[in-house]
UniProtKB/Swiss-Prot annotation:
Biological process according to GO: glycogen catabolic process
Name recorded for this polypeptide: Glycogen debranching enzyme
EC number: 3.2.1.196
Region (Disordered) location: 459-484
Family statement drawn from the similarity comment of this UniProt entry: Belongs to the glycosyl hydrolase 13 family.
Pathway: Glycan degradation; glycogen degradation
Record keywords: Carbohydrate metabolism, Glycogen metabolism, Glycosidase, Hydrolase
């Protein structure tokens, strides 16, 4: 290998062209950048990057090939009060690294939040970037492009979903390979979901605090390398990318979309006591929101916040999204703590990153889902994201639970949430699909735990049960914990059925948490982010198959109702919806606000949802015509008057 040629400022990262590798690094405040390459024995050789175009440093290393391990040392001022923490003694990870060798350890040589620079070299313990080739044969792969009105999302963890599945080959359980295995594809099709939403698959690290307690970060919301697949779920780091793409291709062949949960709000460098391994040493001032005293704005609760209003960081974020789309053919993204994306530092719908996504012909055409809050002032932004974003609807989650469990919600409020929360999302030209309705998600109680626990039980997390929300709107039905007498178990079953039916028969885009369809419990832990064990792994052998069948029937029913699949707002007299009382008459103003929680919802003039959220069996009168109960609900073939137990029943006009 020779000295570096000047190379090109694009594409960003390390790019192999068949003859050598072009390297680039964004740093607006650096004074010098060294590329450091390592041989198989760990010997280091350094090269100055000779080119600079704007704020991008670049150079070309002829003869370099995939498999080369590298990093950067970045020279510049050490001025913590101004947000500058350059220290060439620290080897830094390429923010665009496609593969990483080594884990991020809790090691004093990696800590960079000191008042004075630590000049001890950290190359022996620092993770290294690895050059790869992106080539892959996609054959005839085509994106399913499921319309929002037909979309049913299934949120799952790569490992937890399949690690205990007895029908999968032992060696692929809990891996990317398992996602595309015929056993899993057949299950997804039988269930009826149209999109698999994966918790973060970009490489992440366990926080130093967890490492000291002997725990690990399981969920993955502590990003280390945003362009690299987490290697633990692959046969080897070298094969991770192809194994993931094989799974995407298999899922696409079955008509199932793949959505990635992506963390563009903070990095695993955490606060000033956290490790320095990349962005902090490359250009702290540009990559993060810095306070006047040089510390970080912590709008994420994770110690730092990415400055997604800076042009260089906006470009980084957009290239990250395009990489996953173009290299891995993913169909969309769910953005963690997405209000950070709109901070300038106040939240704006025309924030630079939003504008860049809207203007991008690639990014603006896929499914984009925001978790529409962060923990900073003004961070709660439900309903305020611009098109083409959809949003997690916590109004729906809380209302559904309050209606069926504590039973302290009006019929009017329930109906509003059932109708895709038009008061929140019917603006800026958005359709009902912008409301992503959920009962549960990875954070919080599972659905079974919602009906078994009144209090969280997070002691295993090592924080004396202080972590996790206390606002669960749950109901243990008279006994804390799993198990109980038959009548209690039946009441819990009825509540689960009512909640699932509400989720899957409401207007908007439903999201189902993996495991809720077969009764998975985390034993009351509502923040199992550090539990990589049987608490979070789905136990397929103990699955409630009756509940799975019930859920699948609901999804099939949903796809038959035009009022739900049309993805257009319901208007008075359009034939999509009528709201009736138990006597099949229009609900009065008093019944909306003060009446018993009894109602009938007529959809598309031929599907009737009879709802009884009281504790009494109630006679209801169905509208004129011949009606029959439809799967998964039992009932008479053509009743005119019927008794509805606590829960709901669906009828179809004959």
């Amino acid at each position: 290998m020779t000295q570096l040629a000047i190379g090109e400022a694009t594409p960003h990262g390390a790019t192999y062209d068949g003859h050598g590798v072009n390297f680039t690094l964004f740093s607006a405040h650096a004074e010098r950048v060294e590329l450091c390459v390592f041989d198989s024995r760990g010997n280091e050789r350094r090269y100055d990057l000779p080119g600079r175009r704007g704020d991008v440093w670049h150079g070309y290393l002829a003869g370099a090939r995939p498999g080369l391990r590298y990093g950067y040392r970045v020279h510049g001022p050490w001025q913590p009060a101004q947000g500058h923490r350059f220290n060439p003694a620290k080897l830094l990870l390429d923010p665009y690294a496609r593969q990483v060798e080594g884990e991020l350890k809790d090691h004093p040589l990696l800590h960079g939040g000191h008042d004075e620079p630590d000049y001890r070299d950290n190359a022996a313990v620092a993770p290294k970037s690895v050059v790869i080739s992106d080539h892959y044969d996609w054959e005839d792969d085509a994106a399913p492009r499921t319309p929002w009105g037909k979309t049913v999302i299934y949120e799952a963890h790569v490992k937890g979903l399949t690690y205990l599945h007895p029908e999968l080959p032992q060696e692929i359980r809990g891996t990317y390979k398992a996602l595309g295995h015929p056993v899993m594809v057949a299950y997804f099709k039988q269930l009826g979901i149209t999109a698999l939403e994966l918790l973060p698959v970009a490489q992440f690290a366990s926080e130093p605090r967890l490492q000291r307690m002997g725990l690990t970060n399981y969920w993955g919301y502590n990003p280390m390398a945003m362009f690299a697949l987490h290697p633990a779920w692959a046969s080897s780091p070298e094969t991770a990318l192809d194994e993931f793409r094989d799974a995407v291709k298999a899922l696409h062949r079955a008509g199932i979309e793949v959505i990635l949960d992506i963390v563009l709000n903070h990095s695993a460098e955490l606060d000033l006591d956290g490790p320095t391994f990349s962005l902090r040493g490359i250009d702290n001032r540009s990559y993060y929101w810095i306070r006047d005293d040089g510390d970080y704005h912590n709008w994420t609760g994770c110690g730092n916040t990415l400055n997604l209003s800076h042009p260089g960081v906006v470009e980084y974020a957009c290239e990250c999204l395009r990489y996953w789309m173009e290299t891995c053919h993913v169909d969309g993204f769910r953005f963690d703590l997405a209000s950070v994306m709109g901070r300038t530092p106040t939240f704006r719908q025309d924030a630079p990153l939003f504008a860049a996504i809207k203007a991008c012909p690639v990014l603006s055409t896929v499914k984009l889902i925001a978790e529409p809050w962060d923990i900073g002032e003004g961070g709660y932004q439900v309903g305020n994201f611009p098109p083409p974003f959809a949003e997690w609807n916590d109004h729906f989650r809380d209302a559904a639970r309050r209606f069926w469990l504590p039973r302290n919600l009006t019929t009017g409020e329930f109906a509003c949430r059932f109708a895709a929360s038009s008061d929140v999302f019917k603006r800026n030209g958005r359709a009902p699909g912008a409301s992503v309705n959920l009962l549960t998600a990875h954070d919080g109680f599972t659905l079974r735990d919602c009906v078994c626990f009144n209090q969280k039980h997070n002691e295993a997390n090592g924080e004396e049960n202080r972590d996790g929300t206390n606002s669960n709107y749950s109901d243990n039905h008279g006994k804390e914990g799993l198990g109980g007498p038959l009548d209690l178990m039946e009441r819990r079953r009825d509540s689960i059925h009512a909640l699932l039916a509400t989720l899957l028969l409401s207007q908007g885009t439903p999201m189902l948490l993996a495991g809720d369809e077969h009764g998975h419990s985390q034993h009351g832990n509502n923040n199992a982010y550090c539990q990589d064990n049987a608490l979070t792994w789905l136990d397929w052998q103990q699955a409630n198959r009756g509940l799975t069948t019930f859920t699948a029937a609901l999804i099939r029913l949903r796809q038959q109702i035009p009022a739900l699949t049309g993805n257009s707002w319901w208007e008075e007299g359009d034939g999509n919806v009528r709201w009736l009382n138990k006597n099949a008459q229009p609900l009065s103003a008093d019944e909306w606000q003060n009446g018993p929680k009894l109602m009938q919802i007529l959809l598309s003039d031929r599907f009737l949802i009879a709802i009884n959220a009281t504790l009494e069996v109630t006679d209801i009168v169905l509208p004129e015509g011949e009606w029959r109960a439809v799967p998964p609900f039992a009932g008479e073939d053509n009743p005119v008057i019927t008794a509805v137990w606590q829960g709901l029943c669906v009828f179809q006009r004959g």
